[in-house]
UniProtKB/Swiss-Prot annotation:
Lineage: Viruses, Varidnaviria, Bamfordvirae, Nucleocytoviricota, Pokkesviricetes
UniProt keyword Cytoplasm present: no
Enzyme class: transferase
The family this protein is said to belong to: Belongs to the poxviridae poly(A) polymerase catalytic subunit family.
UniProt GO molecular function: ATP binding; poly(A) RNA polymerase activity
InterPro entries attached to this UniProt entry: PolyA_pol_cat_Poxvir, PolyA_pol_cat_sf, PolyA_pol_nucTrfase_Poxvir, PolyA_pol_nucTrfase_sf_Poxvir, Poxvirus_polyA_pol_cat_C, Poxvirus_polyA_pol_cat_N, Poxvirus_polyA_pol_cat_N_sf
The protein, known as: Poly(A) polymerase catalytic subunit
Gene expressing this chain: PAPL
Length: 470
């Protein structure tokens, strides 16, 4: 055994390594050296500054935070489990290598914020939005409490941190949802801040440590199999703190965005289409039934944005939206006629089962499918003037064989999202799909076609228990 490696492991473990520990951990010596040489006094100072700036309401003394930090950096001395040692080394390495650049930088002097004059007060749109939502408010409220509704008391503090994070890291992190609309219209209320970024895992691990060192409480990262590249941070009561989708840099580049107060938000035009698409998901309609007023102000703001940005006239005149579609129950495929618009495809096959789409793309021997990850929740392939794509939401039926207009419109919105992401033609169909929302009669739901069931195990990162499962 190499004496230098043995000495490093001995100093790190606080004891002489066993033969098994030596051979299992010798590949980690560089990381271990990085951990041991890490200046913990400077790190403790950064944590204190983060606490003072973002978590000032939480009662924890500097000595308590120092103790939490030093205890964690000696945690490897209290276990002989190789699996736990690997987890500790991996998490400590992430912490010492990335914390300063990811969260520590938030305490330094901020760059000048160029205030935005983009503000929308959608008075004229509120009545239109209210009438639209009244028409599609057709779901029966269930008693089930969704995880996103069970929020932690830490959300307010994390939101304060996230506002600064979004400004400092606006090349790699973008927001959408209620907070992004709040930036357009301050009368909108928001809960947690919805984000997409190119380094979600690193960010959430660092945030988990920051919360642990300040509060002394454990937080857990959870990766769910049915959402691509998604991780959620939960507190020790299993309440939601924040979640984040990870996207590739090329996907981030493709997302249409606007800059407000040094923060990039997903272009509200794209968010409007996403909202229309999500109304096909039955639990989102249940949210609408619980609180229509909350959705009204959001929709009104989005409608006002597209009215001003694209000059859309709201008169209810439309001839081709939702685009004509039919549903094959056995194959779970929707066929959409897109021929009346200036698209590069005349027809679209919309699959409700992602594996079936992947199989058919393979059979087509086509290798130019485009994957926009969670931005669209689907790949897109155009082959022989036919688009192939996947729809991840439930499908509502208005009769045994007829797709409910809410879902037909949601599928049409999904197709228009592709047009925007690929810089295709979308203004005329955008005007049509928005006007198709107006002057409608409420149609009850006849049945619900369930969405694709994803299989797989949850991934967990538990700092307290030294567990990392991918």
């Amino acid at each position: 055994m190499n004496n230098s490696i043995t000495l490093t492991l001995k100093n790190y473990l606080g004891r002489m390594p066993t033969v098994n520990e030596y051979y299992m951990l010798k590949s980690q010596v560089r990381n271990i050296q990085k951990i041991m040489f890490f200046n913990k006094d400077i790190f403790i100072s950064l944590i204190k500054k983060n606490k003072k700036k973002f978590f000032y309401e939480i009662k924890s003394s500097p000595s308590e935070m120092r103790l939490h930090i030093l205890e964690y950096f000696m945690k490897q001395q209290k276990t002989s489990s190789i699996g736990k040692l690997y987890a500790i080394i991996e998490l400590q390495t992430i912490l010492v290598s990335t914390y300063t650049d990811v969260l520590g930088v938030l305490t330094t002097k901020a760059p000048y914020v160029f205030p935005s004059n983009v503000r929308y007060e959608p008075r004229s749109m509120k009545k239109i939005a209210h009438d639209i939502l009244t028409t599609i408010n057709v779901a029966t409220v269930s008693e089930k409490v969704m995880g996103r509704h069970n929020v932690s008391e830490l959300v307010t503090n994390v939101n304060l941190l996230m506002e600064e994070y979004l400004r400092r890291h606006n090349k790699s992190c973008i927001c959408y949802g209620s907070y992004s609309l709040y930036l357009l219209n301050p009368s909108i209320e928001y809960g947690d801040i919805d984000i997409m970024q190119t380094n979600s895992r690193i960010f959430l691990i660092n945030l988990a440590f920051l919360i642990k060192f300040i509060t002394g409480h454990n937080v857990m990262l959870l990766k769910v199999p049915y959402l691509k590249n998604y991780m959620v941070l939960r507190d020790d009561e299993d309440k939601h703190i924040i979640d984040s989708f990870n996207v590739r840099q090329d996907t981030m580049h493709s997302i249409p965005k606007i800059l407000i107060d040094n923060i990039y938000i997903v272009d509200p035009t794209f968010q409007l289409l996403s909202m229309i698409k999500m109304f096909s998901q039955v639990d989102r309609l249940e949210d609408l039934a619980r609180n229509q007023e909350k959705a009204t102000i959001k929709l009104a703001t989005l409608l006002e944005y597209v009215r001003v940005k694209h000059g859309i006239i709201f008169n209810g005149k439309v001839t081709n939206m939702p685009m004509p579609s039919s549903f094959d129950h056995e194959k779970r495929i929707i066929t959409v006629d897109t021929s009346r618009y200036n698209f590069s495809f005349k027809k679209c096959f919309v699959y409700l089962d992602e594996n079936s789409l992947s199989s058919d793309i393979l059979n087509l021997n086509a290798d130019d499918a485009i994957d926009f990850e969670n931005v669209s929740n689907s790949v897109f392939l155009i082959n022989d003037e036919i688009m192939y794509t996947y729809f991840s939401n439930t499908i509502l039926m208005s009769s045994k064989d007829e797709i409910h207009e809410i879902s037909a419109r949601g599928v049409s919105a999904h197709i228009l999202m592709y047009q925007i992401l690929t810089d295709g033609d979308y203004l005329i169909p955008l005007s049509d799909i928005v006007n198709s929302l107006m002057f409608k009669e409420k149609i009850p739901i006849f049945s619900i076609i369930p969405r694709d069931k994803k299989t797989g195990k949850h991934g967990i990162i538990n700092i307290e228990k030294d567990i990392i499962t991918h």
